[in-house]
């Protein structure tokens, strides 16, 4: 897969998630954090010129934060937003995780 394709695919899936989330947006602290997380990731993707480990780490940070807000936080997604999240989740595990390089000691639990 070409590098620009990864950036464009990420931008597309996150934009779809943002659009679906905005339709059923109910103000809460977790919802505002999620919206801020989406905006920050899209800003980073607009600046990205190529896929490198820095970008992949940013995408992983986005994924981890969003997962925490959706799974353990008080963020309730509407059905469309949840389906968009599942699509991004699947794409993230298929594309980002295999390319991500982790440096330093890691512990297998």
Please provide the spans of the model-predicted regions.
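Short terminal alpha-helical segments
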Residues: 1-39, 105-106
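Short, intrinsically disordered, low-complexity terminal segments
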Residues: 7, 17, 28, 45, ...
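Alpha-helical repeat scaffolds in large eukaryotic proteins
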Residues: 15-18, 22, 43-46, 64-67, ...
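Charged, low-complexity interaction regions
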Residues: 20-32, 47-53, 74-78
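Short, charged, amphipathic alpha-helical segments
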Residues: 29-39, 56-60, 82-86
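Eukaryote-specific, cytoplasm-facing alpha-helical/coiled-coil scaffolding segments in long proteins
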Residues: 38-44, 90-93
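Short, positively charged, low-complexity/disordered linker segments
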Residues: 44-60, 103
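Amphipathic alpha-helical binding modules
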Residues: 63-109
